């Protein structure tokens, strides 16, 4: 039996899979802790998986974690260090909360489920996305996998060649901090909605917009594809998500698009 675990950044969960890749059981931490969006180490979910399926620690062959925590930590810290002292608050926050981040995954397993920490493996974040897509695909061979994310390990987007589930080759990646996902979250924040929560509202509101408007053209100009270098490019001076924990956009974005919406002011249809 194998256990897959996610946590610390988004809603935590744990899944039990057999040797054939068949999903046996699954729990979201929030359903057990009764804390909406619970992103803590999913100790209740793992405990429930083991107890509900009459398993012991020795019955678990491997535990897979969905990213490589140290890689993620170091890449964001490295980028922030290039912009000191402006990024001091972000760096301080990262190191201050080190023991509550995914870097502590190994220690949490050792503390809560002694023995499982020795079976822990870390999966590349974008590989995890690709493997998840494969699990729901009727086709398992000769596939092109496109992952567009906020950030994972070192990349924010990737393209991979899937020869079969055991042979996956990454062909292209977009390195942090340029990120289509974080760009979307920044616009979500600018419009007065919560990051990682209000993006669906922006998606819904976009249907009422005008893609030919001056404002739409200004927004589309913030990020582009450079066909010569095959890179996603962005003018990072408009963004602060790689520098701050409290604000994702700079004053320059407000100069370009106008004042950001106050989240406490009701939306009035125009």
Language model: regions and residue ranges:
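Short acidic/glycine-rich loops and adjacent helix/strand connectors
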Residues: 1-270
